[in-house]
Amino acid sequence: MIGIIDYGRGNLRSVEKALWKLGYPAKVLESPAELMAVKGIILPGVGAFADAMAALEEKGWIQPLIHYAHSGMPFLGICLGMQVLFEVGEEHGEHKGLGLLPGRVVRFPAGRKIPHMGWNTLHQEKPCRLLEGIPDEAYFYFVHSYYVASEEQEILAGMSDYGVPFPALVGRDNVWGAQFHPEKSSPWGLKLLENFGKWVNEDATVSSHRS
């Protein structure tokens, strides 16, 4: 079972529907106590960085999410859910993120229409399990005004460009994030969600064999 975190800032039902369509059971989690019942989680999100962190704090999600990330189980952030994985966001002042990945979330420079909205290509920087079966320069759907700035090359799996190059798929170990919306990016976004579902199933199988 894949859990989708409900903190009042995400496109929950479309992600849930996409996973079920792909054959991967999913449920929306309304409280941290439900984390124990799932083998992987997705943190969606739309809106402002500061509002998202405030909502996560208000609903008691922050420490449970950090603990879950450290447990080694698959964790995927989508759009704003990817951005809050990082250390600091600069939207409406400087705000602390979850700190699971190194970097800052900054505004696109002037000169381009903001938000960056629509289809854009993903240039694959390195192989990763989420990109298995997806061609280089495949198109994905984006909606965002801020982007991640990180000097940690190791976490950059895919890049896109909107006046400046920006990380579109990031991660290491079990914590990953997609700046685009895979649930709106058929067919390749659904392939990425399928790869995540396979990873969750494989990880759960390995864990059950160990126990």
UniProtKB/Swiss-Prot annotation:
Task: Provide the GO biological process annotations.
Answer: L-histidine biosynthetic process
Query: Where in the cell is the protein located?
Result: Cytoplasm
Q: Does the keyword Amino-acid biosynthesis apply?
A: yes
Q: Which SUPFAM superfamilies match?
A: Class I glutamine amidotransferase-like
Q: Which residues form the Glutamine amidotransferase type-1 domain?
A: 1-206
NCBIfam families according to UniProt: IMP_synth_hisH
> What HAMAP family does this protein map onto?
HisH (MF_00278)
Q: What function does this protein fulfil? A: IGPS catalyzes the conversion of PRFAR and glutamine to IGP, AICAR and glutamate. The HisH subunit catalyzes the hydrolysis of glutamine to glutamate and ammonia as part of the synthesis of IGP and AICAR. The resulting ammonia molecule is channeled to the active site of HisF.
Subunit-level organization: Heterodimer of HisH and HisF.
Name the UniProt record assigns to this protein? Imidazole glycerol phosphate synthase subunit HisH
